[in-house]
Structure formats: C-alpha cells, structure tokens
Amino acid sequence: MLSIDSPANPKDYELHDEPQPNTAEEFKILLKLVGPVMITTLLEFFPGFVAVTLAGNIDSPYAQHYIDAATFSIMLINLSSFSVGFGLASALDTLCSQAYGAKRFEKIGVYFQTGIVVLGAILLPVFAINWFTEDILLWLGQDAEVARLSGLFSRYMLPGIPFLYLYELTRKVLQAQNIMTPLVIIAAIGNTVNIAAGYVLAYHTSIGFHGIAIGCSLGNSVLPLLLVPYFISRPHHLRQWWCQPWSFKAAIRYVGVFLRLGVPGMLMLVMEMWAFEALTILSGLLPHHVVAVAAHSVLVNVNLLVYTAFDGLSVAANIRIGNCLGAGLAKTAKPACVVVLLMTFILALTFTAALYGFSGQIPRLFLDTGDGADLASKVLAIWSPLTIVDGLNAVTQGVLRGAGKQKAAAITNGLAYYIFGVPLGALLAFQYDLGVEGLWLGMGFGSALNFGAMAALMLCYWSWEKLAIEAKDLTEL
C-alpha cells in the first residue's frame, strides 16, 4: 500500500509550503501503481476476450455466426450497461482519490454508499435494454440468425451485472487508497471461473454456445463475493473508510455531487465506447459483411487488449493526480502528469512495433485461415501506428478524472468522435471503398484530435494551484 504525504490537518495546508517535487520519485511511485492496476485491468478485460475466442473455436459450421453473435451481444452490453455503470462510477475516481489525499477517510465510505444508490437505480433500464437485444439488432439491419443468438447470449449475461457493479464501486474505493494486490488476485480467480465454466458448458454440455455467456455471468458474480473473505482477513482495510453504518440519508446527500462528476464521466466513456461500437454496426453493413464483422471483431479485441495497458496507466494517473490535488500538492501533480504521459508514449511505441511486426500472426489466434483473418491482418498493420495517439488519449483522460474535469473531456470526446472520427470513418469505408480499413483510420484520427484538444486545454488553461484549491473545497462539502 503506497502512501501520500499530506498535511496532518488538510483544512490548514498552504500550497506554497509544498516541497519541490522529485521527478525520479514520481516515476517510482507511478511504476508501483501501474503494475498492479495494469494487471487488474487486463484480467477484467478477459471475459469479452474469452467469449469471442471460445465462440470462434466451437467445432460447428455456424462458428462464424457464433463469433458475430458474441461480438454484437458484448457490444450492446458494453453500450448499455458497462459504459453507463462504469462511467457513473468514475465519480469515485475523483471523489475517493482526492478524499484519500486530504485524509478525509470517512468521506470515502459515504461516497461508496452514494455509488450503490446511483448504480442500483439504473439496473432496471439496463436489464430492459439488454432483454431485447434481438429486436434491437434486427432494427439495426443485422442478420436474423446472428440477432437471435445474440439475444439469448445477452439474457444469460444479465445476472452477473449487479455483482459487477458492486465490485466496480469497491475496486475504485480500494484503488483510491492505493490498495492493489487483492484486486489482482480476485480478478484472476474471477477469470478462472469464467474460463472454466464457459469452456465446460460450451464444449462439454448440450448448452453449447450460450454456455459461454453463463460462464461470464458466473465469473462476474464471484468478484464481489471474493471481497468478503478479504475484508475478514484484513478488517483494517474496511474500517479505514467504512467509518459509519449504512445511512440512506447520508448517501442521498451526495447524489448531486456524484452525478455532477459521474454523468460527464459516463459521457466520457460512452462517447468513446459508443463510437468504437458504431464501427461494429457499420462493419455489418459493408459488402461481404460476415467477413467484415469477423475482421473487425479481431481488431476490437486486439485493440481492447492493448487498451487495457493504457487504461492501467490512466487509472494510475487518476489515482496519483487525485491524491496529490487532495493533499494540496499542486507542484507534485504537474510532474506526475508529465511522467505518466512519457511512460505512455514509450509503452505505445512498443505496442506499435509489436502489432505491426506480428500483424500477420495475431488474427489467427482468433480466426482460422481465410478471408476474415487476411483482412484483419491488413487492417492491423494500418492501425498499429495510431496506437500511440490512442494510448496518449486514454491516459490524458485519466489525468482529467483525477482533477475532476470530466465535463471538459466529455465535450472533447463528443466533438472528436462524432463530428470527426465516425463520419470520416464512414466516408472512407463506403464512399472511398476502404471498408474496415477506412472505419479504423477514421477513428484513429478522431483519437488524435481528442488528445490534441485535451493537451491544449491542460497547457493553456490549467492552473495546478487552482485545481488543488478546488479539490480541497470538494472534500469539505
């Protein structure tokens, strides 16, 4: 567990009393945060990765339909439940990290209770939307058999969503306090359950393809349950922030603050995630759509796999920036931002080289040799250099979350992706016959524009001292 040096009484700190920051020390602190967070994020990405992989390897003449069905089902789950729930929960990225930096530990527990109230309130519409996945896909013009398979797949995924929401809230609370290791272990166990159950049910029972979705639900369900023995064995990790019994009145009091940060945070995630999922819909409308969707699904999963590493850096940036601003360490927050972006650039260069160098082999981990794999190889080689801006874009958004500037990021995401990225991708794909390659080029340029806009905002308009004062005011509400 890492520590933050903050004043004994956060109400009395003075920004000018802060010691000069040490860049080398910041690198060490961020490195300690990044490792566990990156592993946890990678493991939490695996359910979708496993679902598509298991579907693609079922020995059936309908294997291609299974891949497409799993891809569409996971797409709608992402759009309607994960992006909305996780986005709203991102309010805790700001609230808890700044409260921990300010040593206002009692606030963390109340914020957590508020999160339960808010995410609990959205469960009914989330369930309603995903229950009608088949109808939605048919309305969007997708293949009828793929829509039918996707609809059942989504229904089997629903039972795990409430458990996943509860785990996500707890994860953010623990990460804000720099508690990382137990989350890695819990995520590993959850994935083991997901893989084992999905494999057995899909390959060795009459349930078949839909056993993969049941495995995902079981894997998600065990995540918060595994926190129980952890808190029993480490009660101080619970008592530090759960300082008072459940209080609906206290939870409701902070709903406004939670939504003020959570709604823009949701829009940040939704704008980006929905833009990428829009590519899935567009790929299904291309000529030879079965091959196009298969190739696109490979790119989606490879990109998500790479993105988890950047998301780990993004979470680390969010935690460190939030802790520093909450503690009034404005001079430390700025170099922390620079260091994490430099780390991101170096990692992105490594990924670019790897994706380009192995662009011919990677798609065959998902698909058998054929037109789908060949097309995926071609698109992956074109996309690989754009991984750099995609990574910088992701981590910069983490910095903005730590500073409580979700609204600005939501606006830039909307403009970059929906005014520029998606329309450009559609234009290249359909008007200039670039197909899947055009879709991904458009989104890559959208990510570049988004990063440029956020970087300009930080360089030209931010005062780190003012951000620290705003964080202090927020923790004292």
Where are these regions (language model features)?
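Short alpha-helical transmembrane segments in multi-pass integral membrane proteins
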Residues: 1-37, 41, 96-163, 193-263, ...
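Signature of the first transmembrane helix
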Residues: 4-14, 28-93, 263-283
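Transmembrane helical elements of multi-pass membrane transporters/channels
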Residues: 32-52, 167, 190, 219-223, ...
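Residue-level hotspots within pore-lining transmembrane alpha-helices
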Residues: 39-43, 47, 80, 84-85, ...
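Helix-terminus/linker motif at the lipid-water interface of multi-pass membrane proteins
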Residues: 45-68, 137-144, 200-207, 266, ...
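Alpha-helical transmembrane segments of multipass membrane proteins
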Residues: 49-53, 128, 135, 169-173, ...
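Small-residue-rich hydrophobic transmembrane alpha-helices
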Residues: 52, 67-127, 131, 167-176, ...
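A late C-terminal transmembrane helix in Major Facilitator Superfamily
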Residues: 385-391, 398-425
